[in-house]
Amino acid sequence: MFGLWNEAVAHAQSYVANRGLQLRQELGRGYDGIVFATDRQTAIKALRYEPLFQRERDVYLRLRENDISEIQGCNVPRLVDWDAELWVVETEIVKPPFVLDFADAYLDEKPDFPKSVMARWQREKRQQFGANWDRVQTIMANLRRYGIYLADVKPGNISFE
């Protein structure tokens, strides 16, 4: 497992070196990858697996095609650049409220989860988001209009504060 993290960090370092950028602080990490700020006020996310990179990049490309930088009052980072060999995407840095992290999203096809799984997921998300759950559902519905189906919905990815 540490090998994958080391590889993601090495990919991030190669990405910035290839573009004459510098890494600043780490902004976060999760199952999908690791995110750093750069010296040009952008964020780069080095993904741990190629399918995650492809999903993240392709969702950002769809957002770009439709000129989406805001959904229901939440900022959406714009795609700046990417590297398909290093599995890195570069986006604008946005402040809350925001919607971000699309590595687990589905494009043009709704994920096929069993009803029992979806019922449990709905309960968990309602509890996590509390009074904002209706707003989260509206954000998800708006993205579905563009063929984007969010799967990794959590307060770190959809933030109102």
Role assignments for model-derived ranges:
Residues 24-69:
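ATP-binding glycine-rich loop module of kinase domains
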Residues 71-133:
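Conserved structural core of kinase catalytic domains
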Residues 1-25, 58:
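Juxta-kinase regulatory segment immediately upstream of eukaryotic protein kinase catalytic domains
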Residues 42-43, 49-51, 84-85, 94-98, ...:
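Short, solvent-exposed loop/turn segments at secondary-structure junctions
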Residues 37-38, 46, 81, 90-93, ...:
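Conserved hydrophobic "DFG−1" position in protein kinase catalytic cores
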Residues 10-11, 18, 50-51, 57, ...:
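Nucleotide/phosphate-binding site architecture used for ATP/NTP-dependent chemistry
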Residues 138-139:
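Conserved hydrophobic core/spine positions of the Hanks-type protein kinase catalytic domain
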Residues 143-155, 160:
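Catalytic-loop of the protein kinase fold
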